[in-house]
From Swiss-Prot:
Identification of the protein by name: Omega-hexatoxin-Hmo1a
GO cellular component terms listed in the entry, alphabetical order: extracellular region
Entry GO MF terms: calcium channel inhibitor activity; toxin activity
Family: Belongs to the neurotoxin 08 (Shiva) family. 01 (omega toxin) subfamily.
Tissues where this protein is expressed: Expressed by the venom gland.
Main function: Inhibits insect, but not mammalian, voltage-gated calcium channels (Cav).
Record organism: Hadronyche modesta
Swiss-Prot/TrEMBL GO biological process terms: defense response
Disulfide bonds: C51-C65, C58-C69, C64-C83
Propeptide: 23-45
Positions marked as site (Critical for insecticidal activity): P57, N74, R82
Transmembrane segments: none
Domain comment, as recorded: The presence of a 'disulfide through disulfide knot' structurally defines this protein as a knottin.
Signal peptide start-end: 1-22
Length: 84
């Protein structure tokens, strides 16, 4: 067995052991994160609102933090929509 095969075997073994241990903390996939207390689960799934910053290309007006897009010339002289 060469080094690469050994490393792959160890990764597979670690994955299998990790899955077995994970089953102990969750009853089923529908229950998701029942074993986490409320605050920890909120930290996992908390996401900041995503918006496009000023002078970045924008396909839609609602993606801009400012809420509006205008056509502006880029460095090549082409007109592109950019957030205000």
């Amino acid at each position: 067995m060469n080094t690469a095969t050994g490393v792959i075997a160890l990764l597979v073994l670690a994955t299998v052991i990790g899955c077995i241990e994970a089953e102990d903390t969750r009853e089923d996939f529908q229950g998701g994160f029942e074993s986490y207390d409320g605050e920890a689960a909120e930290k996992i799934f908390r996401r900041a609102p995503v918006c496009t910053r000023t002078d970045q290309p924008c396909p839609y007006n609602e993606d801009c933090c400012s809420g509006s897009c205008t056509l502006k010339k880029n460095e090549n002289g082409n007109l592109v929509k950019r957030c205000d």
